[in-house]
A protein has these predicted regions:
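Active-site-adjacent substrate-binding region
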Residues: 116
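C-terminal alpha-helical cap/extension of soluble enzyme domains
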Residues: 125-190
Length: 190
């Protein structure tokens, strides 16, 4: 449930309704709180260093605690320094600026929420930063930009869907190894 653009009370109400419905049907619920930079081109002209320093848009600890307690969501996507992929058509094929994660903030969010944290905008982040994030509470990492660009680049170069699929498979295996989650399917997927 992405209610991140809603006011806190409205996000809580919407997410709680979805989580209650999902749980009644034995389905887990992921929710989002905070403003991940770069979504649909937003923040493209903002200075990343200033945002990181001030934590503008980062998931607030008090709000995260309240959100997790009241919504009973199973996973919480948090804003901790990552940048959403190049979603807007005009920047679709551009390399993302290199982002980093506020590891201390991740650890604090993990403590106050007590639930697995999700990282949107995981493509292009330094691998050690990702590993540190995992060690401090990140349990799911979205890397859609990396996967999509691999597919589109290979398809554009070869005009062969099967080669593009094979390139995605290879890149996905590389990412799994780099995140050190190889062999964790049961743990990750239940």
């Amino acid at each position: 449930v992405d209610g991140s653009r809603l006011k806190l009370a409205e996000n809580i109400a919407v997410t709680k309704q979805v989580a209650d419905f999902a749980h009644a049907n034995d389905i887990a619920c992921e929710a989002e709180l905070g403003s991940v930079m770069g979504h649909e081109g937003a923040g493209a002209n903002m200075d990343y260093e200033e945002i990181f320093r001030t934590k503008k848009g980062f998931t607030d600890l008090g709000e995260a605690k309240q959100f997790a307690e009241e919504t009973k969501c199973d996973w919480l996507s948090v804003a901790v320094g990552s940048i959403h992929g190049a979603i807007a058509e005009g920047v679709r094929n551009q390399k993302k600026p290199e982002a980093r994660l506020d590891i201390e903030h991740i650890a604090d969010l993990s403590k106050v929420t007590g639930i697995p944290l999700v990282l949107h905008g995981g493509s292009g982040i330094n691998n050690q930063c990702i590993l540190d994030g995992i060690a401090n509470g990140i349990a799911k990492i979205n890397v859609g930009t990396e996967i999509r660009q691999t597919y589109e680049r290979t398809l554009g170069e070869t005009n062969d869907v099967e080669k593009a699929r094979a390139a995605v498979y290879t890149r996905t295996c590389e990412i799994i190894r780099s995140f050190r989650i190889e062999g964790n399917q049961e743990k990750l997927c239940g």
